[in-house]
A protein has these predicted regions:
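Short glycine-/polar-rich loops that comprise or flank the Walker A/P-loop
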Residues: 60-61, 83-86, 145-150, 190-193, ...
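Conserved Walker B
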Residues: 38, 45, 66-72, 93-94
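Conserved helicase NTPase catalytic core signature
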Residues: 1-62
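Signature of the SF2 helicase/ATPase Hel1-core->accessory helical subdomain module
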Residues: 71-129
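Conserved helicase C-terminal RecA-like lobe
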Residues: 229, 233-238, 245-321, 333-338, ...
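Conserved helicase/translocase motor-coupling segment
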Residues: 168-255
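Helicase C-terminal subdomain and adjacent C-terminal extension
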Residues: 103-151, 254, 301-358
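Interdomain helical connector at the RecA1-RecA2 junction of SF1/SF2 helicase-like NTPases
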Residues: 113-203, 209
Length: 358
């Protein structure tokens, strides 16, 4: 135990231990000893390199489990996979994709012939594992193509309709079966799940890549107030958006409103709600709430056409499946239906209103 505390203690303790022992040689014994007391050890891709710095032998670990593998780029796993005897890869390739910071031109030039599919920026640990899995299901995509998904879990237990139907038909080809139970304490919304549009004639273009629309922020706030009047708590409401600038803009707007106008209470914990319940789709993976407000942002003129087209099925799927009971989409219904096939598909299952209809 003394050796364990020295190795995983402070940096000075490890340096002192290194004076008397070859850390590479004793690491397997130290790890085995640790796992007698702690059978399962968790880490992150960012931290596992340092954790295994003295583990340099192939297949020296037992089984590693990679969670949320659909978000991980393959190169992040190479070191841990080299050291493991077995790997269990768990994730959803139809949800959040890896965040890739490498420039497109570099990705195109670095690879040789015959490896085109491995140069995709959307390639994940999950998709590579699925490609090697003989036990799989074929999912038909909205564009008619097919995806090979290893050992798919087909029972869904989170969302009511229309969220389930939109996600199931958009991303899973109708593959899933909905077994979501009725909530023990259901809420009484001010309106059914719907798309909220608005008059776009006075919306001005914003600068650069800022996609926040003040009118959408005002609509979202009014909707929150109407939900609060129906005893829906702040903690049960997520504000999700495809764009960082929209999340930032709405958070600043909410901060600018006086506490009396918003009617915050001590139980609401204003700071935590602003930090945790407003954000981009990427920050809500694995989370859920009774109500989701999906704020699309984007100007109605041509300045945001590229941004509108950028929002893919994975983004829509994650946003919709965060909502257990109700979803409200805020955006220019005409523009999004015209330029984005994924949101156009979602509109089939959502009545379109303006805030005056509430």
């Amino acid at each position: 135990m003394q050796l364990l505390s020295q190795y995983w203690g402070s940096l000075n303790d490890r340096k002192n231990l290194q004076k008397n022992f070859d850390l590479d040689a004793i690491f397997p014994a130290l790890l085995n000893s640790l796992m007698i007391a702690v059978p399962v050890i968790s880490s992150t891709f960012a931290a596992v390199e340092r954790f295994l710095i003295n583990c340099k032998s192939e297949s020296s670990l037992g089984t590693i489990i990679i969670d949320e593998a659909g978000q991980a780029s393959p190169h992040m796993l190479v070191g841990a996979l080299f050291r493991a005897q077995k790997a269990v890869v768990v994730g959803d390739p139809k949800q959040i994709e890896p965040v890739q910071t490498v420039q497109d031109l570099f990705v195109e030039k670095i690879g040789g012939e015959g490896i085109g599919k491995y140069r995709s920026k959307e390639l994940s640990v999950q998709s590579l594992a699925d490609a090697q899995n003989p036990f799989a299901g074929i999912i038909k995509n909205l564009d008619g193509s097919e995806s090979w998904v290893g050992c798919p879990l087909v029972i869904h237990r989170r969302c009511k309709n229309p969220m389930f139907t939109v996600a199931n038909e958009l991303s899973y080809g109708g593959f899933m079966i909905n077994k979501t139970m009725e909530p023990k304490e259901s809420i009484e919304p001010c309106k059914e799940s719907c798309w909220i549009t608005y008059d776009t004639s006075n919306i001005e273009s914003t600068i650069g890549k800022d996609r926040y629309i003040q009118l959408q922020g005002q609509i979202a706030f009014e909707l929150i107030q109407k939900l609060r009047a129906r005893n829906v708590e702040f903690k049960d409401i997520f504000i999700i958006t495809p764009f960082t600038s929209v999340a930032y803009g709405f958070k600043k707007y909410m901060e600018s409103l006086s506490n009396d106008i918003v009617n915050w209470t001590k139980e609401d914990n204003k700071k935590d709600w602003l930090d945790d319940n407003i954000g981009t789709v990427h920050t809500f993976q694995g989370k859920e709430a009774k109500v989701v407000i999906y704020m699309l942002g984007c100007q109605s003129d041509d300045s945001a056409n590229g941004a509108i087209k950028w929002v893919n099925a994975n983004n829509v799927n994650v946003a919709f499946t965060r909502a257990r009971e109700y979803i409200y989409v805020i955006g220019d219904a005409v523009k999004w239906a015209e330029l984005n096939k994924n949101l156009a598909f979602a509109q089939r299952y959502l009545p379109i209103y303006t805030l005056k209809d509430f």
